[in-house]
Amino acid sequence: MDTFITRNFQTTIIQKAKNTMAEFMEDPELQPAMLFNICVHLEVCYVISDMNFLDEEGKAYTALEGQGKEQNLRPQYEVIEGMPRNIAWMVQRSLAQEHGIETPKYLADLFDYKTKRFIEVGITKGLADDYFWKKKEKLGNSMELMIFSYNQDYSLSNESSLDEEGKGRVLSRLTELQAELSLKNLWQVLIGEEDIEKGIDFKLGQTISRLRDISVPAGFSNFEGMRSYIDNIDPKGAIERNLARMSPLVSVTPKKLKWEDLRPIGPHIYNHELPEVPYNAFLLMSDELGLANMTEGKSKKPKTLAKECLEKYSTLRDQTDPILIMKSEKANENFLWKLWRDCVNTISNEETSNELQKTNYAKWATGDGLTYQKIMKEVAIDDETMCQEEPKIPNKCRVAAWVQTEMNLLSTLTSKRALDLPEIGPDVAPVEHVGSERRKYFVNEINYCKASTVMMKYVLFHTSLLNESNASMGKYKVIPITNRVNEKGESFDMLYGLAVKGQSHLRGDTDVVTVVTFEFSSTDPRVDSGKWPKYTVFRIGSLFVSGREKSVYLYCRVNGTNKIQMKWGMEARRCLLQSMQQMEAIVEQESSIQGYDMTKACFKEDRVNSPKTFSIGTQEGKLVKGSFGKALRVIFTKCLMHYVFGNAQLEGFSAESRRLLLLIQALKDRKGPWVFDLEGMYSGIEECISNNPWVIQSAYWFNEWLGFEKEGSKVLESVDEIMDE
């Protein structure tokens, strides 16, 4: 931790933090976590101060706005934090006296010359709101509060006291520090600022003690027994000792690997007796239908946006006599339709709230009251009918054509642009010119890719869902599924459907909240009925598109998600980073061969090189070539699909199949790899190929690729034989 602090903070900040600890008789050597917290706190205070200025008339400027006017500007905030305590108190009393305000009972961190208010700054590992109210209870209204969390949220008593750029700088720095700490395995040992405050010792009562004893993991009878086991366990050398005991029983015979030893993975994916893998993404992707409404580009509340879109398509909004096209196994179509009508009425009314009434059909859809009942261990032991539920093993499925179709459609170009990326400043160093050029080419390809529209829809929806889940835990809320796209210079609000959030008392990260989705589509589910067993589908009307009448369907599904999945959904834009890194690796490789920057040559062409082409798929058993831009869109779409269908099966498949890929690469490089228990490795891979659409499709593509590689190896062997002769 000491090395980490030295490397990540300025010397002056570290010295001030150490001086602060010395005043309280604390030793930085013994308490590095406290030193880190003080350094972070100090740095945040300086970031806030360095970003905001006032001129002689008291007008506020940010650092960017004040460029060229530095002579007439002074800091808006006086930093009190970091001063010796006696000097800090003197400064605080002087400022209060000078500006005619009451001196706070506690020492502040900052003083705002504009509002003439003292400010307390707080940093927390938990929720910003929780720490805010903890501080508020202690300080009252004696000073303003600015609370920032490593979880990327904040809470300000005065929202106008800090602009968006200032908030962004602070949160970005906290995220950076958290990532660095996690990398060094220091994050878990770090104590939050709020945890340093002293607690209260109390004796455990009988009820709490009993609850503690029945909460221990299986295999332990009570808490004291578990604590005794942990205190006496010796983890050092345990693995080595067990391996030594097993060694006489293990017989390993290495074998040199040949191309003939490799076989396709997951043979069951070709078994036509198995059902096709169903669509199980959280939202519709290529089958989505957005109700478009032209807008001026101003920000709107989601309810206002949805209301305007529904008003434009009133025939769909007012439909009361739908046609049931398809029904999922456990669905109650009448309840689902009633819930949809309630959603439409909630959005269409004049009230600002989007809260839904807790009707019996809403309770059915959200699973209200259907949670498992917890029973004491003593009762369960005495009752012979009580037993552990058998684990549910996923059913095996075969490959489905719709996955490849989704891939093809999502990687195509459209006329709509939905990608929302922040602006970056002008280039300074020569390397930044290269980066900007590559970014320009990359964004031009990705901007109008269908996958980027779907990605932004996921980002916006999961952001709204997480906000509503935290803000309205006990309420049912209607959440519009929206996006904003730009087409030929015009902005359009898009409404893809509505969702209903159930009760969301999410204490743990894996606690589930029920979400019922209602999404518009022009795809008739009967065309590929094997794709939609999880959906109940109604036909709710038709629209005229380019002079042709198209039926509009409402796809309904009862689903669930948790905090972890919602947070990943908010960060789905990370797919851009991964695809851009792969693009840059290809460009760098080409540039190193040619001896100069090949960015333009890869995307278009230059005076010497024609544009690059890459294998992007197969058609009728032959490889299909595509441009560099097309290959980039395919990579980006694959990254998105990896996020959308990500689960334990995909994680396991990726990890296990990586070993097989390394063996194939070694064969291609003619390194003569040796293996043992090859069939065991295949078994580990195939265990993960069950009912995840992306895993099954990846296995299908892998088998195709393996076939091509085997054919190529035969050609090379024939060439070698001719050369030997």
From Swiss-Prot:
It holds the Pfam family Flu_PA. Its EC number is 3.1.-.-. A motif (Nuclear localization signal 2 (NLS2)) lies at residues 183-244. Binds 2 manganese ions per subunit. It is an enzyme of class 3 (hydrolase). Plays an essential role in viral RNA transcription and replication by forming the heterotrimeric polymerase complex together with PB1 and PB2 subunits. The complex transcribes viral mRNAs by using a unique mechanism called cap-snatching. It consists in the hijacking and cleavage of host capped pre-mRNAs. These short capped RNAs are then used as primers for viral mRNAs. The PB2 subunit is responsible for the binding of the 5' cap of cellular pre-mRNAs which are subsequently cleaved after 10-13 nucleotides by the PA subunit that carries the endonuclease activity. One of its GO terms (biological process) is viral RNA genome replication. A motif (Nuclear localization signal 1 (NLS1)) lies at residues 125-140. Phosphorylated on serines and threonines by host kinases, including human casein kinase II. GO terms for molecular function: endonuclease activity; metal ion binding; RNA binding. It is found in: Host cytoplasm; Host nucleus. Its cofactor is Mn(2+). The gene is PA. Its main location: host cell. Mn(2+) 2 binds at residues 81, 109. Mn(2+) 1 binds at residues 41, 109, 120-121. This is Polymerase acidic protein. Influenza RNA polymerase is composed of three subunits: PB1, PB2 and PA. Interacts (via C-terminus) with PB1 (via N-terminus). It comes from the Viruses. Keywords: Cap snatching, Endonuclease, Eukaryotic host gene expression shutoff by virus, Eukaryotic host transcription shutoff by virus, Host cytoplasm, Host gene expression shutoff by virus, Host nucleus, Host-virus interaction, Hydrolase, Inhibition of host RNA polymerase II by virus, Manganese, Metal-binding, Nuclease, Phosphoprotein. It comes from Influenza B virus (strain B/Singapore/222/1979). Belongs to the influenza viruses PA family. The lineage of its organism: Viruses, Riboviria, Orthornavirae, Negarnaviricota, Polyploviricotina. GO terms for cellular component: host cell cytoplasm; host cell nucleus.
